[in-house]
Amino acid sequence: MAGERRPLMAANWKMNKTVREAQDYMAALLPRVADLAGEVDVAVFAPFTCLSEVARMAEGSGVLAGAQNFFYEDSGAYTGEVSAPMLLDVGARASIVGHSERRELFCETDESVARKARRAVEAGLLPVVCVGETEEERDAGRMWEKVSGQVRAVVEGLGDASGGRVVFAYEPIWAIGTGKTASPEDAQDAIGRIRGLLRELRGEGFAEEARLLYGGSIKPENISEIMAQKDVDGGLVGGASLEVGSFLQLVEAARG
């Protein structure tokens, strides 16, 4: 990881945790990360039902409270959706955009993901944009075709936003929740290519400012090798983030 980019370790709780469970988690997490300011950024992406409580508890701590999704319009007849202004209103400062589960289960497209990323930046939310390929696409030699198309769609819609205002998370879909993990070398290959594409599309400054995460069955046993890769700036963590103890191990590993 480049020294000038601060690592980011992000917990994605997915559809887990009640308000009480979220309170207990944050009460255990916050004292342990209080001394990490300036060394590691920590984010917690919570379900909508407990997001306001996570944001309330995180206020002033340096921990980013984030949502797992939102819609790109600010208001209107969009039953079941929430908007960027609504997230800001409850204290969220970031949002995951385009997670593979959203793309697969809820039919999100490169176009809709790009619109969400642009709206997040406009509203002042930090988008964590997920990109990645299926096992079939990888086996067919189409990994880079898929990932580069996803990245291009987002970057071309960002206007003049700086690289520091967007995060990309490479999550090989075949490694999410399966116990399979891309090798550290595979993670670096994909993420290094993404940084190269950002450089091609937006220049050196944008590419060097943007933080690029790895996501896909991250756990304490493999995080150190992954974080040792020069272009990997942190992790988007699913299952291993549900227990505060294991997530703290990942945060400590990112600290170096």
From Swiss-Prot:
Q: Where is the active site?
A: H99 (electrophile), E171 (proton acceptor)
What pathway, per the record? Carbohydrate biosynthesis; gluconeogenesis; Carbohydrate degradation; glycolysis; D-glyceraldehyde 3-phosphate from glycerone phosphate: step 1/1
Q: Does the keyword Isomerase apply?
A: yes
GO MF annotation list: triose-phosphate isomerase activity
Reaction(s) catalysed (UniProt annotation): D-glyceraldehyde 3-phosphate = dihydroxyacetone phosphate
Q: Which UniProt keywords apply?
A: Cytoplasm, Gluconeogenesis, Glycolysis, Isomerase
Gene3D superfamilies assigned to the protein according to its UniProt record, in alphabetical order: Aldolase class I (3.20.20.70)
A Pfam entry, by short name:
TIM
Record keywords: Isomerase included?
A: yes
Which Gene Ontology cellular component terms are annotated?
cytosol
Which residues of the sequence carry a binding annotation for substrate? Answer: N12, W13, K14, G177, S217, G238, G239
Could you tell me which InterPro entries the record lists for this protein?
A: Aldolase_TIM (IPR013785), TIM_sf (IPR035990), TrioseP_Isoase_bac/euk (IPR022896), Triosephosphate_isomerase (IPR000652), Triosephosphate_isomerase_AS (IPR020861)
Q: What is its EC number?
A: 5.3.1.1
Function, as annotated, reads: Involved in the gluconeogenesis. Catalyzes stereospecifically the conversion of dihydroxyacetone phosphate (DHAP) to D-glyceraldehyde-3-phosphate (G3P).
| HAMAP family with a match to the protein in the record | TIM_B
Q: Which family does it belong to?
A: Belongs to the triosephosphate isomerase family.
Task: Cite the record's note on assembly.
Answer: Homodimer.
Name of protein = Triosephosphate isomerase
Q: Which organism is it from?
A: Rubrobacter xylanophilus (strain DSM 9941 / JCM 11954 / NBRC 16129 / PRD-1)
